[in-house]
Curated annotation (Swiss-Prot):
Record-level GO cellular component terms: cytoplasm; nucleus; proteasome core complex, alpha-subunit complex
Quaternary context: The 26S proteasome consists of a 20S proteasome core and two 19S regulatory subunits. The 20S proteasome core is composed of 28 subunits that are arranged in four stacked rings, resulting in a barrel-shaped structure. The two end rings are each formed by seven alpha subunits, and the two central rings are each formed by seven beta subunits. The catalytic chamber with the active sites is on the inside of the barrel.
Biological source species: Dictyostelium discoideum (Social amoeba)
Name the record gives this protein: Proteasome subunit alpha type-3
SMART domains on file: Proteasome_A_N
Superkingdom per UniProt: Eukaryota
Length: 248
């Protein structure tokens, strides 16, 4: 970053001579240093998977979750700072509740994503605030079918068939590009998400991690859920076996 230290990174509202907002770049760096997030929009729903890094063996299993419910038909996954992400999760739940109270129906996924994106963007306009150091994958099923959107610190909001964030973003993206999303079921996507996360995990730098999986599909009656233990264990076994086969 050519202008670091020259004053252009002191305020999020200040552009550098080459047209950058360095504090937004720094927020993106926080996302890049997070555990890998992978999301797949299948033909019958959406699957979220997160490589939750475990910095200490004293950490209780299931702590600091990165997959969360927003409404019955909406689930999200987080890459980046959890403290910042909690604010976005709270905001998303409030937006979903207010929309349903006003219009009498569940909020469309695209509308929710755009509202959170606008909230993020607001935090790039004023010197008295800073960008959120996290990106959020928003998924669900509405009247338009399965939906997957990524909302980034800059306030961008983009729909995807498959998406990745975090340390293994590029390697995961390369794997996602090989998938025919329109032919894949959620059960198959759970295995693929697990396989990709295990394949991009860096065992040298990050030895321990927990695999978090969430899904919403016709099989769950269009309700977002944490993947059941039986399916989770089956997917993890498949991922580990695939990794062993690849290393042979």
């Amino acid at each position: 970053m050519s202008s670091v230290g020259s004053g252009y990174d002191l305020y999020v509202s200040t552009y550098s001579p080459d047209g950058k907002l360095f504090q937004v770049d720094y927020a993106n760096k926080a996302v890049e240093n997070s555990g890998t997030l992978v999301a797949i929009k299948a033909k019958d729903g959406v699957v979220l998977g997160v490589e939750k890094l475990v910095p200490s063996k004293m950490l209780c299993s299931g702590s600091n979750r990165r997959v969360h419910h927003i409404d019955t038909h909406v689930g999200v996954a987080i890459a980046g700072f959890l403290a910042d992400a909690r604010q976005l999760i709270t905001r998303a739940r409030s937006e979903a509740k207010n929309y349903k109270s006003t219009y009498g129906q569940p909020i469309p996924i695209k509308v929710l994503s755009q509202r959170i994106a606008s909230y993020n963007h607001m935090h790039t306009l004023y010197g008295s605030v800073r960008p959120f150091g996290c990106s959020i994958a928003i998924t669900g099923i509405d009247q338009y079918g399965p939906q997957l959107f990524l909302v980034e610190p800059s306030g961008s909001c983009v729909g995807y068939f498959g998406a990745s964030l975090g340390k293994g973003k590029q390697a995961a993206k390369n794997e996602l590009e090989k998938i025919k999303f329109s032919e894949m079921t959620c059960r198959e996507a759970i295995k693929e998400v697990s396989r990709i996360i295990y394949s991009v995990h860096d065992e040298v730098k990050d030895k321990d991690f927990e695999l978090e999986l969430g899904w919403i599909s016709t099989e769950t009656n269009n309700v977002h859920q944490i993947v059941p233990k039986e399916l989770h264990d089956e997917a993890e076994a498949y991922a580990k076996q695939s990794l062993e086969d690849a290393n042979m």
